[in-house]
């Protein structure tokens, strides 16, 4: 697919894709994913062509930006590593997020409380989000999916080939997708300047790690307060001793 020069993959983005292990695919290859294989390593792991990954990210972003109402786009992730990324993507682009379990009938049963009629669905994994893809096929909703080389591609209209099992890989794909959508909408005018949002914001974080970090920050703050109190007491003691010395000298 030939793209205008402004959509070319930059060296910085290529380094991000490689650093996040987006290029590491599975050992098995589904027949429709064969065009995305760059090569096979000696250990049997198939390497994804990140150039084709970028082309599909741009294509998906152009589809998303073409929908007038951002809320008509539904971003789904039942996979734990993709839930934070989906929520951040929705916050930045205005899409509707479904993070966690997808309620069966959300697209087909209008009686359910969670019923939606989207114009586009984006899923993190065709296997874990199979119910959403199946219901989308019933009501003719186009589907964009992050697919590994062994992922099923039935009812998937646009497949973004990548490593959809790693937390950094998933977060980075959603980050790049959100950035390209905002650029196409005109929210980010200058393509030569980096986005102020960092990719780390889209990465999954273990709740225990977050709690531990908060506890460490609280402990550090408490230690600083204690040090300040001790310093103040020492200063007061020094001032008092100096005053007494002057009184004794005056006698």
UniProtKB/Swiss-Prot annotation:
The modification N-acetylserine is found at residue 2. Its main location: cytoplasm. Keywords: Acetylation, Cytoplasm, Ribonucleoprotein, Ribosomal protein. One of its GO terms (biological process) is ribosomal small subunit assembly. One of its GO terms (cellular component) is cytosolic small ribosomal subunit. Residues 222-236 have a biased composition (Acidic residues). Residues 213-251 are annotated as: Disordered. CDD domains: RPS2. It is found in: Cytoplasm. GO terms for molecular function: structural constituent of ribosome. Required for the assembly and/or stability of the 40S ribosomal subunit. Required for the processing of the 20S rRNA-precursor to mature 18S rRNA in a late step of the maturation of 40S ribosomal subunits. This is Small ribosomal subunit protein uS2. It comes from Lachancea thermotolerans (strain ATCC 56472 / CBS 6340 / NRRL Y-8284) (Yeast).
């Amino acid at each position: 697919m030939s793209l205008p020069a402004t959509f070319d993959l930059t060296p910085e983005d290529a380094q991000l894709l490689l650093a996040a292990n987006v290029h590491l695919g599975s050992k098995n290859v589904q027949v429709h994913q064969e065009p995305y294989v760059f090569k096979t390593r000696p250990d049997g792991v198939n390497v994804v062509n990140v150039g084709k990954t970028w082309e599909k990210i741009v294509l998906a972003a152009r589809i998303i930006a073409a929908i007038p109402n951002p809320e008509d786009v539904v971003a789904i992730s039942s996979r734990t590593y993709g839930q934070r990324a989906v929520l951040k993507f929705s916050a930045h682009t205005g899409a509707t997020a479904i993070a966690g379990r997808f309620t069966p009938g959300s697209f087909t049963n209008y009686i359910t409380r969670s019923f939606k009629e989207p114009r586009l669905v984006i899923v993190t994994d065709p296997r874990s989000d199979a119910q959403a893809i199946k219901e989308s096929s019933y009501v003719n909703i186009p589907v964009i999916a992050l697919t590994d080389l062994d992922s099923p591609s039935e009812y998937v209209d646009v497949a973004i080939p990548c490593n959809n099992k790693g937390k950094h890989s998933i977060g980075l794909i959603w980050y790049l997708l959100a950035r390209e959508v905002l650029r196409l909408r005109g929210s980010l005018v200058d393509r030569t300047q980096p986005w102020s949002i960092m990719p780390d914001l889209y990465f999954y974080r273990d709740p225990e790690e977050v709690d531990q970090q908060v506890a460490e920050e609280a402990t550090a703050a408490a230690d600083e307060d204690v040090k300040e109190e001790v310093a103040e007491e020492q200063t007061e003691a020094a001032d008092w001793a100096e005053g007494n010395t002057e009184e004794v000298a005056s006698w």
